[in-house]
Each structure stands twice: as C-alpha cells, then as structure tokens.
A protein has these predicted regions:
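Binuclear metal-dependent hydrolase catalytic cores
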Residues: 1-131
Length: 131
C-alpha cells in the first residue's frame, strides 16, 4: 500500500507576513511538502521551506553521532517559476549547506537563463553573498 501525505508549508503570495490576523493560514510564502513512500518532494521554495529544512536537519542530527554515521538528507525540489515569493526560503534551506545532502532541484527556464544560473545568483550574487 502506498503512503502519501501533503503538508502546506506556505500559501501566501508576494511576501511573508507575521500578524495575528493571518494565523489561520500561516504567513509563509509558497511551499508544499509531499511525501510519497518515503520520498520527499517539495513544490516551490518560499519561506515555508525554512521549516522543512530545519526539520530535516533535526532528523539528520538524530540519525547518528557524526556525519559518517548519519543518514543523508534527501529531497527533490520543484520550482514552478522564478519569482521571489517562490524562492525566498531557498538560501535558508539548511540541507543545501550540508555536503552529504542529496537535494535535486528542477524548474523552468526564465528569461533565457537556466535555473542553475538563477539559483547561483540568488545564493552567491551581490544581494545575498555567501563566501
């Protein structure tokens, strides 16, 4: 029997919001977590992705005493389109910064630039330098 679950991690558009009037649906931007038979698929990388990453990191740390014993974090991230509200959490997705992580990212070409170029600019460009 297949095991399938969906969790909405962010459903806001344009920008995240933190206000008591918005607690019912949360304040994070686009991010949906889908688990299919133990495979993690993430739809869009809005600010909801930050919590997904933190939870993955917690499981990773709990899985062994050191990086040699730990189970690598695995996920497939699908980016629907290159808009800021669909990428705001990407730079803060902690599994990206752990060398043993196995994160596959797929998305559309935008304005004749590849997804890799767009994400490189986001991660290493002047607006968010990680040296």
């Amino acid at each position: 029997m297949s095991k399938f679950s969906v969790k909405f991690r962010g459903v806001r558009g344009s920008y995240p919001i933190a206000d008591k009037d918005f607690l019912q649906y949360g304040g994070n931007t686009s991010c949906v977590e889908v688990n299919v038979n133990g495979h993690l698929i993430i739809l869009d990388a809005g600010t909801g992705l930050i919590n997904v990453g933190n939870e993955l990191l917690g499981k990773y740390i709990a899985s062994g005493l050191d990086s040699n014993e730990r189970t690598p974090m695995k996920a497939t991230v699908l980016i629907s389109h290159i808009h800021q509200d669909h990428l705001q959490g990407f730079t803060f997705f902690r599994p990206l910064h752990i060398p043993s992580s196995q994160i596959n990212v797929f998305g559309n070409v935008n304005y004749n630039e590849s997804l890799a170029d767009e994400l490189s600019e986001l991660l290493f460009g002047k607006s968010f330098p990680l040296d």
